[in-house]
Amino acid sequence: TEALGVMRIEKGHAAGNELNGQTTANNLGLGKMVSKLNDCIGNTMSEREELNKENTLKLVGFIPTNKNQSLVAGSHFIEKGKTENLENDQGWMSSVAFSPMLKHSIGLGYIIRGNQRYGEKVHAVNPLRKEIIEVEIHSPHFYDTEGELLRG
């Protein structure tokens, strides 16, 4: 199961850590897949105005700028130069793995407006370990992004 966990993170697939009861299809980048015509699971939440605002959390990928550093699940994202407190908390890292294909640590997590911030660098702060790691916001798809290997 560990290999499957790494592969799902490399491909950007949401699983238990990303589906915690606080997230919607919109947060996962799947909002357009929710039917507007027929009732379905997630339909009611997808119509709530507050959950469809521009500044909601979006599932994205994270790469450490120093490829020798390991990402830590549970770290919180703070903009560089900002004080590390709840007021400046932008989101959290939900899943991490070492990618044997990319040869470095990768992570999935939620950050405000994440899908509009690819390439931006933020701090992944873990107060319990007293660690601050600079990470780059990335597409949640790390490997075979176009699906060429999948489809041959």
What spans do the regions from the language model cover?
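Conserved, structured C-terminal
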Residues: 1-152
